[in-house]
């Protein structure tokens, strides 16, 4: 009888520690999610700041714009941080 109570006691301790660890796991995942959200917001803010200055943004955007418009069979041109696709005449 004493052995059964001892093993039951150990099982309860293991279950309690598992529940505690599961709670910590959620806490850790929440912290990771918050950090990733902060990083995303900082990157978005930096990109918006960069693209607000057209003299810096156009060189960054231009290559993407050329490729984007080439897929549409057009010529890509960056104007005021916006990609303009000019249609090619046949």
UniProtKB/Swiss-Prot annotation:
GO terms for molecular function: potassium channel regulator activity; toxin activity. Its main location: secreted. Residues 1-22 form the signal peptide. It is found in: Secreted. One of its GO terms (cellular component) is extracellular region. It comes from the Eukaryota. The keyword Disulfide bond applies. Belongs to the long chain scorpion toxin family. Class 2 subfamily. This is Potassium channel toxin BmTXK-beta.
